[in-house]
């Protein structure tokens, strides 16, 4: 009996360890990609790092040799200390953790593999898609039935994102396409304290940090996590969603260097440090209503992060199928977020072809009236599920 207790304790310690390492890797990837995606004073950013890393996890499952090593290093698993042999189990356990404790918020995750009808998957890979990713298999004809294949993929995308994203692909894919790996996530969170629609008024927002415009702005005095770091001229806010499992973190840099310089100095460690500074305060919040819709071809961005092997002729994806040589042509990502008085709805699809101590003080003010960064995160696992940058409204 003593041996059994020791064994159980050991298993818990190991599981908790690689669970934390997976989170660290994913959050580093989130911040790295936020810095790497192209932006401008007129262009906003919004994406789901969790969706992208999950879709790429299905590629990882079929990679071999140098291609596997490149993915292992490029997605930060090596740097976070997650052993290569633990990665797939960590994906499965991590997904389960994100579903624990959901109450008032909705967080749905779905995976699928659209497979050319004549492509024979290796049984081990098919088993991994099922057991690790719970992926649905869609048999399609990319050669002769291109439009029908696209329609089936887009129907899946629309259903799994609760109609927030109509389609992932607008036109036919290359007839050489043999496999499209898909991940879709949907989040709906209701603010812990809702804003009053009647209090929403036009207020000034500085597009690009310089050009004033009038936008619908929600206002209310509410308890949120808040901290002003005067030396950095940075305001940090954490707005909770009902149930306490999710929150939106806002970073509002007021310094003269602007949001781009601030963003490029940001690291996952600094972000977590900023969030750790917030204290529960009564704050008069002014937050613009906004809706962002984005679409990315991530091939170049992933290459800039060192993920290169899967895109070249040297790619070794022989763990997927023995039928010919497979390479990844692109990684496509679409995301939508809408923030209003009720809360937040966000969806994303990827295809691979702190509440601290309560302090009673006078009301503070948070006026989000210029470009800012925001993150939607799971407050228990600390995962960054969505990330964005609002420059222009």
Swiss-Prot record:
Induction: Induced by blood feeding. It is found in: Secreted. One of its GO terms (cellular component) is extracellular space. InterPro entries: Serpin_CS, Serpin_dom, Serpin_fam, Serpin_sf, Serpin_sf_1, Serpin_sf_2. Keywords: Complement system impairing toxin, Glycoprotein, Immunity, Protease inhibitor, Secreted, Serine protease inhibitor, Signal, Toxin. Highly expressed in female salivary gland during blood feeding. Expressed in female midgut and ovary during blood feeding. GO terms for molecular function: serine-type endopeptidase inhibitor activity; toxin activity. Its main location: secreted. The keyword Endoplasmic reticulum does not apply. PROSITE patterns: SERPIN. SUPFAM superfamilies: Serpins (SSF56574). GO terms for biological process: immune system process. Glycans are attached at residues 198, 245. It comes from the Eukaryota. Residues 1-16 form the signal peptide. Serine protease inhibitor that modulates blood feeding of ticks on vertebrate species. Inhibits host neutrophil elastase (ELANE) and proteinase 3/myeloblastin (PRTN3). Moderately inhibits host chymase, cathepsin G (CTSG), trypsin and alpha-chymotrypsin. Decreases host neutrophil migration. Decreases nitric oxide production by host macrophages. Decreases host complement activity. Belongs to the serpin family. This is Iripin-5. It comes from Ixodes ricinus (Common tick).
């Amino acid at each position: 009996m003593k041996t059994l207790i020791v064994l159980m304790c050991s298993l818990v310690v190991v599981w908790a360890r690689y669970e934390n390492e997976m989170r660290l890797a994913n959050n580093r990837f989130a911040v790295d990609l936020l810095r790497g995606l192209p932006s401008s004073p007129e262009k906003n950013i919004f994406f789901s790092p969790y969706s992208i890393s999950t879709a790429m996890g299905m590629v990882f499952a079929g990679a071999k040799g140098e291609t596997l090593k490149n993915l292992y290093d490029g997605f930060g698993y090596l740097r976070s200390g997650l052993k290569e042999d633990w990665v797939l189990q960590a994906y499965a356990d991590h997904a389960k953790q994100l579903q624990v404790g959901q109450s008032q918020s909705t967080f749905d995750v779905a995976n699928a593999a659209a497979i050319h009808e004549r492509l024979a998957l290796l049984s081990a890979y098919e088993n991994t898609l099922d057991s690790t990713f719970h992926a649905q298999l869609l048999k399609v004809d990319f050669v002769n039935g291109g439009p029908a294949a696209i329609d089936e993929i887009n129907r899946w995308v629309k259903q799994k994102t609760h109609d927030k994203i109509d389609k992932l692909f607008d036109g036919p894919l290359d007839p050489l396409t043999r496999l499209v790996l898909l991940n879709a996530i949907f989040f709906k969170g209701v603010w812990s304290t809702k804003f009053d629609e009647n209090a929403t008024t036009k207020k000034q927002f500085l597009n690009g940090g310089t050009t004033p415009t009038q936008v619908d702005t929600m206002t209310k005095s509410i308890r949120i996590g808040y901290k002003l770091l005067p030396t950095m001229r940075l305001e940090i806010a954490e707005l909770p969603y009902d149930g306490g499992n999710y929150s939106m973190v806002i970073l509002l840099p007021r310094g003269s260097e602007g949001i781009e310089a601030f963003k490029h100095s940001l690291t996952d460690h600094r972000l977590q440090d900023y969030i750790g500074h917030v204290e529960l305060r009564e704050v008069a919040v002014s937050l613009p209503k906004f809706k962002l819709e984005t679409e990315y071809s991530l091939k170049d961005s992933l290459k800039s992060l060192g993920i290169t092997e899967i895109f070249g002729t040297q790619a070794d994806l022989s763990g997927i199928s023995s039928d010919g040589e497979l390479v990844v042509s692109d990684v496509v990502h679409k995301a939508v977020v809408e923030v209003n008085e009720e809360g937040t709805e966000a969806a994303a699809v990827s295809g691979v072809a702190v509440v601290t101590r309560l302090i009673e003080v006078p009301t503070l003010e948070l006026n989000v009236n210029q470009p800012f960064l925001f993150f939607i995160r799971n407050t228990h696992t600390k995962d960054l599920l969505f990330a964005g940058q609002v420059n222009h409204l």
